[in-house]
Amino acid sequence: MKIFPAIDLRDGRAVRLTQGDYDKMTVYSAQPCGVARRFIRTGARNLHVVDLDGAKDGTPSMANLVEIEALVQQGHAFIEVGGGIRTEERIRQYLDLGVGRCILGTVAVENFAFVERMAQRYQEKIAVGVDARDGMVATHGWQKTSGEESFSFCRRLRDAGVRTVIYTDISRDGTLGGTNLEAYRKLTELEGLEIIASGGISSVKEIEALKDMGAGGAILGKAVYDGKLDLGMSLRAAGDMRDELDDKLPLF
């Protein structure tokens, strides 16, 4: 199972939100690349990067775009990016930069046919983020709730050719209170769809449980930033530790 340490960007800084609330934001670093290098030196192979400004407003932030480009250029990790990606032009821009996978969110609810076309055209380079609040899909950086039931929406995505869904239980995100294992147990029963778990993962036992049930990956955020969850132990539990650590990779 893959482990994705998360780097959420706002105004070019690495931050974390609590339950998707932009008024409950903690700034962890003004140097996102430094954060990424620490994760990579610990053994991470993958990074999950979100443009929070783009997710909220629908317009990708230039400051965040600069940081994403820098993250890609320093190499050493597969990078998936989400937040405000609502056009094919933006998808192409990120893929041309060297981003490994683009995550579509709000547009999947508002323009399902577009997501179906993009999934067929770009295949494994497209994932969809399904963010659930009380079982319903939330959009616009979690600021609005749609009329789509989250599990049935995941089935629709699979049937449309989407290969990977990143499923977040918003009520657990950033709370350090544990993730919704029961939801992931149901989701992993959907054949032909890779499920990446996100939101509230705060223990190695949860990572082991997700791996055992067949989840394709887990996104780690606040628990790692706050020191509650050891990234190295998490990588080893998932079987996703980098073979060789690059001790020469600068931290800053």
Predicted regions and their residues:
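C-terminal helical cap(s) of enzyme catalytic domains, especially alpha/beta-barrels
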Residues: 114-121, 211-220, 224-252
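Alpha-helix-loop-beta-strand connector modules within alpha/beta enzyme cores
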Residues: 58-80, 116-131, 176-203, 243-244
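Glycine-rich, proline-tolerant flexible connector loops at the mouths of alpha/beta enzymes
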Residues: 46-64, 106, 167-177
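Glycine/small-residue-rich loop that forms an oxyanion/phosphate-binding "nest" at active or ligand-binding sites
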Residues: 53, 60-120
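Conserved anion-binding
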Residues: 15, 19-23, 92, 99-173, ...
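Catalytic cores of alpha/beta
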Residues: 75-101, 182-220
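Conserved, mostly hydrophobic/aromatic
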Residues: 8, 39, 47, 94, ...
